[in-house]
């Protein structure tokens, strides 16, 4: 999610009026959701089947991978571009375009693919499920993605706390080497490709691509200034693409079933299937693969068993992980779960980690806790983030008690705007957006709490 820079500053294209004529063009899809089982890419999401090589092959992994590799980088990039796949780590940048930055004449330096498995966003656990239950999808995805970029090797940077997941991944890599699927002459294609696992040490900031690269190199995980971008100077000073686990893992299936198949799901510019995490006040917290642009209400009601106490008991939802602004129940009624629809709703898809809060939630305290997290995880390199997030944390602690004045709400908003967009990476943005969402939708609750505190304070003084 640290890659999700300036999402709220984006704009949607103007609405286009459609005229129906007598041609045979199929009408645009208007309803989304209810993904069929045969269209699911992640078929072992809940670990009900064997995750090792034989089990993975029985579910279609490593099928005709040699043919995909032999078709070459241009063909793979063409299918990924046709699919409309956008980065699944939060930023939503077109994957085919990003990968094509690496597909240029070599200057003698090796190229690398780095997979960001440092999943530290509160509420997010989709990549963990892929690595734990479907590790071969990721390993095969590294090979296919690496071939598209002309990469020599892939480094999978995995969160240090994911001990069991790292173990499963290492087993899957060993099995792939022993079967000749990766390494020298991978899959018999004549293409050499290695895969390495690098364990992180728990720093959230290493989810930012350049901080992750610094960590791989053995340095302190602090974001780099850009340019130069990783595609020019990345890990070990070589051209590098950093990609999310889910983004990489879906690429072999896109190549096998065709980019047009993947593009048939979701709205235009928001195509494909997506893993959604649903947690919080729901009857059945889960991770589920669903079509992009599925209505948020349907996602919660159908897959998570609904809000505890019923839909009318819903207070607010954080739709894309802790760094995206919350939206109230009134917006949740109709909003679609895709990049553009959520930007229009003044929030973002982020990592698609849906955090549901019912009416029992102290919404001010919940957001204050998130700000405390970002204050703790700031690397301290940028002054607006280091000082501003610490200041916001102190103010939010007083807002929880109500020990503040209404004018301070505007001050907090202004500080959040001064942090947003003024830092090297997007951690400052991720800390500012939850505060902005709270003020935008729950300002009356903040003012009421301050009023109650003032009345109680006056009553105590009168008692003396």
Swiss-Prot record:
Binding site for [4Fe-4S] cluster: 379, 382, 385, 425
SUPFAM superfamilies: Nqo1 FMN-binding domain-like, Nqo1 middle domain-like, Nqo1C-terminal domain-like
Alphabetical keyword list: 4Fe-4S, Acetylation, Electron transport, Flavoprotein, FMN, Iron, Iron-sulfur, Membrane, Metal-binding, Methylation, Mitochondrion, Mitochondrion inner membrane, NAD, Oxidoreductase, Respiratory chain, Transit peptide, Translocase, Transport, Ubiquinone
Protein's cellular compartments: Mitochondrion inner membrane
Residues found modified as Omega-N-methylarginine: 257
Single GO biological process annotation from the record: mitochondrial electron transport, NADH to ubiquinone
Protein name (database record): NADH dehydrogenase [ubiquinone] flavoprotein 1, mitochondrial
Organism lineage string: Eukaryota, Metazoa, Chordata, Craniata, Vertebrata
């Amino acid at each position: 999610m640290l890659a999700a820079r300036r999402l709220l500053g984006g704009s949607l294209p103007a609405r286009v009026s459609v005229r129906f004529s007598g041609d045979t063009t199929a009408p645009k899809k208007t309803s989304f959701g209810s993904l069929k089982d045969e269209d699911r890419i992640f078929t072992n999401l809940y670990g009900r089947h064997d995750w090792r090589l034989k089990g993975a092959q029985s579910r279609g992994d490593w099928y005709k991978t040699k043919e995909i590799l032999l078709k070459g980088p241009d063909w793979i990039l063409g299918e990924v571009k046709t699919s409309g796949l956008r980065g699944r780590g939060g930023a939503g940048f077109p994957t085919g375009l990003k990968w094509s930055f690496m597909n240029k004449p070599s200057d003698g330096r090796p190229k690398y693919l780095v997979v960001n498995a440092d999943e530290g966003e509160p509420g997010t656990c989709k990549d963990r499920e892929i690595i734990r239950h479907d590790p071969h999808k990721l390993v095969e995805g590294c090979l296919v993605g690496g071939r598209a970029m002309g990469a020599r090797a892939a480094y999978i940077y995995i969160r240090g706390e994911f001990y069991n997941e790292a173990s499963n991944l290492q087993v899957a890599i060993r099995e792939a080497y022993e079967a000749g699927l990766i390494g020298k002459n991978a899959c018999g294609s004549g293409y050499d490709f290695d895969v390495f696992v690098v364990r992180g040490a728990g720093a959230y900031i290493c989810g930012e691509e350049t901080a992750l690269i610094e960590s791989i190199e053995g340095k302190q995980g602090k974001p780099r200034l850009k340019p130069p971008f990783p595609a020019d100077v990345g890990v070990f000073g070589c051209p590098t693409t950093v990609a999310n686990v889910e983004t990489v893992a879906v690429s072999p299936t896109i190549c096998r079933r065709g980019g047009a198949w993947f593009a048939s799901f979701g709205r235009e510019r928001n195509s494909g299937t997506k893993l959604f995490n649903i947690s919080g006040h729901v009857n059945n917290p889960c991770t589920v693969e669903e079509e992009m642009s599925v209505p948020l209400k349907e996602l919660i009601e159908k897959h998570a068993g609904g809000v505890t106490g019923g839909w009318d008991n819903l207070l607010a939802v954080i739709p894309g992980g802790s760094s995206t602004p919350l939206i109230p129940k009134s917006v949740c009624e109709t909003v679609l779960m895709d990049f553009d629809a959520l930007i229009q709703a003044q929030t973002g898809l982020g990592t698609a980690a849906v955090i549901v809060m019912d009416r029992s939630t102290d919404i001010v305290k919940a957001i204050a806790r998130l700000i405390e997290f970002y204050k703790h995880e700031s690397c301290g390199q940028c002054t607006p983030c280091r000082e501003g997030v610490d200041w916001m944390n102190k103010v939010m602690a007083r807002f929880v008690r109500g020990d503040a004045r209404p004018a301070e709400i505007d001050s907090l908003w202004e500080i959040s705007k001064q942090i947003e967009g003024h830092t090297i990476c997007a951690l400052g943005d991720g800390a500012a957006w939850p505060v902005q969402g709270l003020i935008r939708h729950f300002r009356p609750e903040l003012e009421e709490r301050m009023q109650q505190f003032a009345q109680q304070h006056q009553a105590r003084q009168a008692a003396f």
